[in-house]
C-alpha cells in the first residue's frame, strides 16, 4: 500500500495509532496558514477528534519512494469554507517527514485573481 493511501485511510478512520506509524518522528507540517508549522504530536493531536477535518475526492497525483503529491476536497468542523487542498509530502524511511499544503477556498463568492 502506498504511504499516501495508508495516511488517507488512517486519517479517514481516525486511527491515531496507524497515523503514528506513518508519520516520521521528525515530521514537519507546514499548512502555509498564519505562519505556523506543526510537529508529529501536533498532527496526531488534531486527528481522530470531533473537530477533525474530513476529506473527499482524494487523488494521488504522484508518488514514489521519496515524494508524493495528493489532492482532495477538505471540509472543516468549524463551518469555514471547504477547500481544495494540494499536498506535497517528502518521505524518509517509508514515513512522512515533511508535508506542505496549499489550498483554495470553495466558497460561492470565490473569484480567481484577475477576474
Where do the language-model regions lie?
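Amphipathic alpha-helical repeat scaffolds
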Residues: 5-9
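A sequence-level detector of short linear motifs
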Residues: 38-39, 98
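A beta-strand edge to alpha-helix "cap/lid" segment located at domain peripheries
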Residues: 30, 44-115
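Structural motif corresponding to alpha-helix initiation and N-cap regions
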Residues: 12, 40, 54-55
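Short, well-ordered alpha-helical segments enriched in acidic and aromatic residues
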Residues: 13-28
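A short gly/proline-enriched turn/hairpin at secondary-structure junctions
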Residues: 28-37
Amino acid at each position: 500500500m502506498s504511504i499516501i493511501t495508508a495516511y488517507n485511510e488512517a486519517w479517514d478512520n481516525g486511527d491515531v495509532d496507524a497515523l503514528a506509524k506513518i508519520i516520521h518522528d521528525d515530521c514537519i507540517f507546514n499548512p502555509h496558514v498564519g505562519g505556523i508549522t506543526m510537529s508529529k504530536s501536533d498532527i496526531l493531536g488534531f486527528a481522530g477528534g470531533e473537530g477533525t477535518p474530513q476529506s473527499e475526492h482524494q487523488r494521488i497525483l504522484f508518488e514514489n519512494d521519496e515524494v508524493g503529491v495528493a489532492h482532495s476536497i477538505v471540509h472543516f468542523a468549524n463551518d469555514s469554507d471547504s477547500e481544495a487542498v494540494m499536498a506535497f509530502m517528502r518521505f524518509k524511511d517509508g514515513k512522512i517527514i515533511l508535508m506542505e499544503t496549499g489550498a483554495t477556498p470553495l466558497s460561492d463568492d470565490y473569484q480567481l485573481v484577475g477576474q
